[in-house]
């Protein structure tokens, strides 16, 4: 709160100073011209219309920047200033001798750029001292007459014989074929019934528990 009141007090002091400056300016202008009374009344109306409390140093800085937009001195000449002229020292650098030196080169370049149509019409070929005279190109040989019909194609060479790239090893003797007797036929699958029948047919009936009755044991 104290800071706010202090800032308001500073602003009121600035407003009083600005008002006193404006009053002095209006009084001076009234003493110089007769018609200053009307302008003074207009200025007083403008001052009363504007809010004096809103006017600050920032507005004053903006007004100064509008009058002088850049830091350059308006008295000095610039690139865009039409009233600026080069000084005597600048003019002395470029003399008439430079113009005389530039003219013969430009004339030589113009003479070398003469179009070929003008040279043919005049019939004369101006040859500058630094270039050789032009020599005519030799005439082109006549184009060969087109041959009608297809020319026979050369015969094709014989196809190369394909050689096997696989390396053959040493010659092995052929294996002799052994022809022996035919293999025996395997016995038919045995079953307990047939086996028992076979055994019963070939062996005599067992009578008593004797050792000869069990020869397979």
UniProtKB/Swiss-Prot annotation:
Residues 43-79, 89-102 have a biased composition (Acidic residues). Residues 63-64 are annotated as: Interaction with host histone dimer H3/H4. Its main location: virion. The keyword Chaperone applies. One of its GO terms (cellular component) is viral tegument. Residues 106-132 have a biased composition (Low complexity). Residues 32-42, 208-217 have a biased composition (Polar residues). It is found in: Virion tegument; Host nucleus; Host cytoplasm, Host perinuclear region. Residues 64-68, 81-86, 90-94 are annotated as: Interaction with host histone dimer H2A/H2B. Keywords: Chaperone, Host cytoplasm, Host nucleus, Virion, Virion tegument. Disulfide bonds: none annotated. Residues 1-217 are annotated as: Disordered. Residues 136-145 have a biased composition (Pro residues). The keyword Chaperone applies. Belongs to the lymphocryptovirus BKRF4 family. Forms a complex with the host H3/H4 dimer and histone chaperone ASF1. Also forms a complex with host H2A/H2B dimer. Interacts (via C-terminus) with BGLF2; this interaction is important for infectious virion production. Overcomes the host DNA damage response (DDR) triggered by double-stranded DNA breaks by binding to host histones H2A/H2B, H3/H4 and to cellular chromatin. Can associate with the partially unfolded nucleosomes, promoting the nucleosome disassembly. Interferes with histone ubiquitination and recruitment of repair proteins. Binds directly to histones through its N-terminus. This is Tegument protein BKRF4. It comes from Epstein-Barr virus (strain B95-8).
């Amino acid at each position: 709160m104290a800071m706010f009141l202090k800032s308001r007090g500073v602003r009121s002091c600035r407003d009083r100073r600005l008002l006193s400056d404006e009053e002095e300016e209006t009084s001076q202008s009234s003493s110089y011209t007769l018609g200053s009374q009307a302008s003074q009344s207009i200025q007083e109306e403008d001052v009363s219309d504007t809010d004096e409390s809103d006017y600050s140093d920032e507005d004053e800085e903006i007004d100064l920047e509008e009058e002088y937009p850049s830091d350059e001195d308006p008295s000095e000449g610039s690139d865009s200033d039409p009233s600026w002229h080069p000084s005597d020292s600048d003019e002395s650098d470029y003399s008439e001798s430079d113009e005389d030196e530039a003219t013969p080169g430009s004339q030589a370049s113009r003479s070398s750029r003469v179009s070929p149509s003008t040279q043919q019409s005049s019939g004369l070929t101006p040859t500058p001292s630094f270039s050789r005279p032009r020599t005519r190109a030799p005439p082109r040989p006549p184009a060969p007459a087109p041959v009608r019909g297809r020319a026979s194609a050369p015969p094709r060479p014989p196809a190369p014989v394909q050689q096997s790239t696989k390396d053959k090893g040493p010659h092995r003797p052929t294996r002799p074929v052994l022809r022996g007797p035919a293999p025996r036929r395997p016995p038919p699958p045995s079953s307990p019934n047939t086996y028992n029948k076979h055994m019963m047919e070939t062996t005599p009936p067992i009578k008593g528990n004797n050792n000869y009755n069990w020869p397979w044991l």
